[in-house]
């Protein structure tokens, strides 16, 4: 029996600090996502989103601070009463007044945050590190006394002084937090910086490390993955990455990255086929389109156009796909209605239409399609019309013998018969 080949994209076997095969998700669509410019979630919509996330399998659902507004408090209490499998968290300032309200809502844990960079200490709360440490200890001990989880996070971690960061994390770790948080609040960090900070922090604290990455410079997914490689265990995500400014690590995008590195873990833990429905739910709620190049669910995500690509995909999808669309309840699509098409793609379309043409005839009709494609944009109906007209012209009793040479359906990769729909923004 041939031994299975090792996954070249997996964590290195000897890297015992890596959590690529042992990570957890904190979904913040109902906290960070509420800070997205278009977001307004009423109670009913929050409950619908929370149930969908729970069904998908996220480990934690983070909610807006109950002191943000009276309705925020009521919504927090309502979601806590749903009996979800996911643990419910709320996100508060490092302040006793906030903590006293939060612990009475029924949450499973409280996420405490305070700015530690010189920018936030000067222009936000105006406090020094001694005050921050004292406040953190007071709030943490109070929350712990209520028997619920507690996370302490610095805000703007990557623009904070490293000595200040390590000192505050050592302080809170000693009194027993469940985890400490690293927040790239302005999206300035790159993967190398993330890896180095996480590895340094791992030598200082014994608790789990949670990471929160903004996407201002396009590194949120890469930073999240690198954080797990470095030893962080929990990653904050939101559906479609919605959040303050241009958001944080997207749930679907991170799943695309993680299934490559840890396929067995990801497939066994999360209902990946639910991603499309969850993204549609949230996209409709905030009135945005799902981007065409969105990992997994973008309408071009599994579309192949160039002739040489199509030929290889039809023979073995792994030639041009690192992700299997079937893992996500999706189908690949060969875009054959264009001048770049190849005869193998047209042959697949001929088979879908249940027509019989020889390879030479398929090459001939392909030339006709490419010729028209040089003149104008084509659609599926154009190509089907050319194929059917050509078939009618050449049909003879001899052509029927081509049936004997057709592949069985099981030998041909499953293809979508029409391209994925282009989403349009819902009307107001």
From Swiss-Prot:
Which residues does 2-oxoglutarate bind? 31, 91, 151, 185
Q: Where in the cell is it found?
A: Cytoplasm
GO biological process entries: DNA repair; lysine biosynthetic process via aminoadipic acid
Binding residue positions for Mg(2+):
32, 212, 214
**Cofactor(s) needed for function:** Mg(2+); Mn(2+)
Kindly list the GO molecular function terms attached to this UniProt entry.
homocitrate synthase activity; metal ion binding
What are the start and end residues of every segment in region (Disordered)? 399-428
Q: Which positions carry Phosphothreonine?
A: 396
| NCBIfam families with a match to the protein in the record | LysS_fung_arch
User: Which HAMAP family does its entry note?
Assistant: Homocitr_synth_fung_arch
Q: What else is known?
A: Present with 28100 molecules/cell in log phase SD medium.
Which family, according to the similarity comment?
Belongs to the alpha-IPM synthase/homocitrate synthase family. Homocitrate synthase LYS20/LYS21 subfamily.
Stated name of the protein? Homocitrate synthase, cytosolic isozyme
Q: Which organism is it from?
A: Saccharomyces cerevisiae (strain ATCC 204508 / S288c) (Baker's yeast)
Q: Which gene encodes it?
A: LYS20
């Amino acid at each position: 029996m041939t031994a299975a080949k090792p996954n070249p994209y997996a964590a290195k076997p000897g890297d015992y600090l890596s959590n690529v095969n042992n990570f957890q998700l904190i979904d913040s669509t109902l906290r960070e996502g509420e800070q997205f410019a278009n977001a307004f979630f009423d109670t009913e919509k929050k409950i619908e989103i929370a149930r969908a996330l729970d069904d998908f399998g996220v480990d934690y659902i983070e909610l807006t601070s109950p002191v943000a507004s009276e309705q925020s408090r009521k919504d927090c209490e309502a979601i806590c009463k749903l009996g979800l499998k996911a643990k419910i968290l709320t996100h508060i300032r490092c302040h006793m007044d906030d903590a006293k309200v939060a612990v009475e809502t029924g949450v499973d844990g409280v996420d405490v945050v305070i700015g530690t960079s010189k920018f936030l200490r000067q222009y936000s709360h105006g406090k020094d590190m001694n005050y921050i440490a004292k406040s953190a200890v007071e709030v943490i001990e109070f929350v712990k006394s209520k028997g619920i989880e507690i996370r302490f996070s610095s805000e703007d971690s990557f623009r904070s002084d490293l000595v200040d960061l390590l000192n505050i994390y050592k302080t809170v770790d000693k009194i027993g937090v469940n985890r400490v948080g690293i927040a790239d609040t302005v999206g300035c960090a790159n993967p190398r910086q993330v890896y180095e900070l996480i590895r340094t922090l791992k030598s200082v604290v014994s608790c789990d490390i949670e990471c929160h990455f903004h996407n201002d410079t396009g590194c949120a997914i890469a930073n999240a993955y690198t954080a797990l490689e470095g030893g962080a265990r929990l990653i904050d995500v939101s559906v479609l990455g919605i959040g303050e400014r241009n958001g944080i690590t997207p749930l679907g995008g991170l799943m695309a990255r993680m299934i490559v590195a840890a396929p067995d873990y990801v497939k066994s833990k999360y209902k990946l086929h639910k991603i499309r429905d969850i993204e549609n739910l949230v996209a409709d709620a905030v009135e945005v389109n799902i981007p065409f190049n969105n990992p997994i669910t973008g309408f071009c995500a599994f579309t192949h156009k160039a002739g040489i690509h199509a030929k290889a995909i039809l023979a073995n999808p792994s030639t041009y796909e690192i992700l299997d669309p079937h893992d996500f309840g999706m189908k690949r699509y060969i875009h054959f209605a264009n001048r770049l098409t190849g005869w193998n793609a047209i042959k697949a379309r001929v088979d879908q239409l249940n027509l019989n043409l020889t390879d030479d005839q398929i090459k001939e009709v392909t030339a006709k399609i490419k010729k028209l494609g040089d003149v104008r944009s084509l659609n599926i109906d154009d190509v089907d019309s050319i194929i059917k007209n050509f078939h009618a012209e050449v049909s003879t009793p001899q052509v029927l013998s081509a049936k004997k040479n057709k592949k069985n359906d099981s030998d041909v990769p499953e293809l979508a018969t029409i391209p994925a729909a282009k989403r349009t923004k819902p009307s107001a």
